[in-house]
A protein has these predicted regions:
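Phosphate/NTP-binding elements of NTP-utilizing enzymes
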Residues: 2-129
Length: 129
């Protein structure tokens, strides 16, 4: 936390609402807090695509109905599903004490790429979070 931030500023209703949304709304959180490496090696905010938003809505619907999410995703390559799942897991474990996540792939190289993505989320995320 920056030393020039006062307690009054931290308790400002607008700031508190933003923090609440960052904690509770992944669609709000992702483009503001998660940085990804694009196909052309640029670092940019995670702007969810159509497939990612669809997967998110299906997961949230199941969570609303059952209280949890269990999905098996049979996916084509390069749709962003692994990025979405990595971001969702990162959001969950960093905002809810005691939660863990684990992603395993069929290849060590791919598992390492997903770990690097999560590491990037952590290193490049806003300090305030």
């Amino acid at each position: 936390m920056p030393s020039d931030t006062s307690v009054d500023e931290l308790n400002d209703p607008r700031r508190l609402e933003i923090r609440r949304r960052l904690r509770n709304e992944f669609l709000y959180y992702a483009p503001r807090a998660l940085q990804i490496r694009t196909k052309d090696a640029k670092i940019e905010p995670l702007a969810l695509n159509t497939a990612q938003i669809y997967l998110h809505r299906m997961a949230e619907d199941q969570k609303r109905r059952t209280g949890y999410v269990r999905k098996i995703v049979l996916k084509g390559r390069q749709q962003g599903c692994s990025t979405y799942i990595g971001g969702r897991f990162y959001h969950r474990v960093t905002h809810h004490r005691g939660h863990k996540a684990f992603i395993l792939t069929h290849k060590q190289e791919t598992t390492e790429e997903l770990f690097d993505m999560t590491d990037r989320f952590h290193k490049l995320g806003p300090d305030e979070l």
